[in-house]
Structures are given as structure tokens and as C-alpha cells.
UniProtKB/Swiss-Prot annotation:
It is found in: Cell membrane. Keywords: Cell membrane, GTP-binding, Lipoprotein, Membrane, Methylation, Nucleotide-binding, Prenylation, Protein transport, Transport. A lipid is attached at residues 204, 206 (S-geranylgeranyl cysteine). It is a lipid-anchor. PANTHER family: RAB FAMILY, RAS-RELATED PROTEIN RABG3B. It comes from Glycine max (Soybean). GTP binds at residues 15-22, 63-67, 125-128. Protein transport. Probably involved in vesicular traffic. The keyword Membrane applies. This is Ras-related protein Rab7.
Length: 206
């Protein structure tokens, strides 16, 4: 029997309350979207398995509260992260303006060995609202911010319409895999069928 490698990757999703962090995660993992908004209290996580090349990857995606009073919980949740996903609402300028704070807070609390090399990914969510007519943060403005942070990847997404969600999280998985802390578990003889068909590599390059 051959040995297959399964890797656990910890991904932290940050951003203001109401930008759609939970909705993006639910769309990616469960293929579900709800119009009802319920604020995340503290932090919670979901998992998703996928295959990248010869690696069986388990993404542990942490959904953290956007409210300021819960930010002190960050230390325990940020530590050991392999990738940080920053999310803002393209229709709310304040959610974009606070990205700098989220970025700095993560680096401060997570304290990665090389902050400049740690993988971040930016998602501009809710591009479906009002057919895009109500957006206030331009794509150029977002890309300029990413360029200033070392050319971090940027995706425009819609959790409601399931637009770019899979592509974004595949890029997230690849970035996290490149930064992994070698938390590998070996399983003997895991068949290909163990990875659900809809979670196979899509072929999208990050």
C-alpha cells in the first residue's frame, strides 16, 4: 500500500462584521447561502478536504467575530495559522479602510517568523449587490492596496451567487500549503475515492 499525505492547514478569515465572512465559508464548504444575517460570536471553524497535486489537504477555516469587543480573543486563534484571508464589502468603504488594522493586528497577534513572507489573500465580497452599482471601492483601489502589501492575491467574490468562491479558496489552500508548518499525518492506502469528486482539484492556478 502506498502512503498518502494528509496535511492540516489553518486558515484565519478576518474582516469587519457583516462583510460576508461566514457566508463565504458556508458557500465554499456547504454550497449554501442564507439571506439571514447572524453575527459570529467569538470564533468558530469549518473544515473542507481537497486534493492539490499529490497532497490530501484539510483546510481548517476559522471564522472570527468582526466586532471590536471580540478582537482580544485573537491571540489563541491566530497562532499557528498558515494563511490569513482579509475580507471587505465592496459597497462599504469603512470595511476597506479597516483592512490595515486587521492586517496589523494579525501580524502582531500571530507573530509569524517572517511577517513579510506570510501569505495573505484579499477578498472583495458582495459584488452582486445592486448589480454592482452601489460599490464604492474600485477594483483598482483594492489592487493598489494589495500591491503595497507585497502583491498579495486579490479576488472579487459573491457568496450569494457563488462567484469566484472556489477559485479564491483554492488559491488560499495553495498559499497555506506553501507556508505549512509540516503538520502532516500519514494514512496508509487512502483511495482516490476518499476525496469527494466535487472537491478534486479544479485546475485553477493561483
Amino acid at each position: 500500500m502506498s502512503l498518502r499525505r494528509r496535511t492540516l492547514l489553518k486558515v484565519i478569515v478576518l474582516g469587519d462584521s457583516g462583510v460576508g465572512k461566514t457566508s463565504l465559508m458556508n458557500q465554499y464548504v456547504h454550497k449554501k447561502f442564507s439571506q439571514q444575517y447572524k453575527a459570529t460570536i467569538g470564533a468558530d471553524f469549518v473544515t473542507k478536504e481537497l486534493q492539490i497535486d499529490d497532497r490530501l489537504v484539510t483546510l481548517q477555516i476559522w471564522d472570527t467575530a468582526g466586532q471590536e469587543r471580540f478582537q482580544s480573543l485573537g491571540v489563541a486563534f491566530y497562532r499557528g495559522a498558515d494563511c490569513c484571508v482579509l475580507v471587505y464589502d465592496v459597497n462599504v468603504m469603512k470595511s476597506f479602510d479597516t483592512l490595515e488594522n486587521w492586517h496589523e493586528e494579525f501580524l502582531k497577534q500571530a507573530n509569524p517568523p517572517d511577517p513579510r513572507a506570510f501569505p495573505f489573500i484579499l477578498l472583495g465580497n458582495k459584488i452582486d449587490i445592486d448589480g454592482g452599482n452601489s460599490r464604492v471601492v474600485s477594483e483598482k483601489k483594492a489592487k493598489d492596496w494589495c500591491a503595497a502589501k507585497g502583491n498579495i492575491p486579490y479576488f472579487e467574490t459573491s457568496a450569494k451567487e457563488d462567484y469566484n468562491v472556489d477559485a479564491a479558496f483554492l488559491c488560499i489552500a495553495k498559499a497555506a500549503l506553501a507556508n505549512e508548518h509540516e503538520q502532516d499525518i500519514y494514512f496508509q492506502g487512502i483511495p482516490e475515492a476518499a476525496v469527494p469528486e466535487n472537491e478534486q482539484r479544479s485546475g485553477c492556478a493561483c
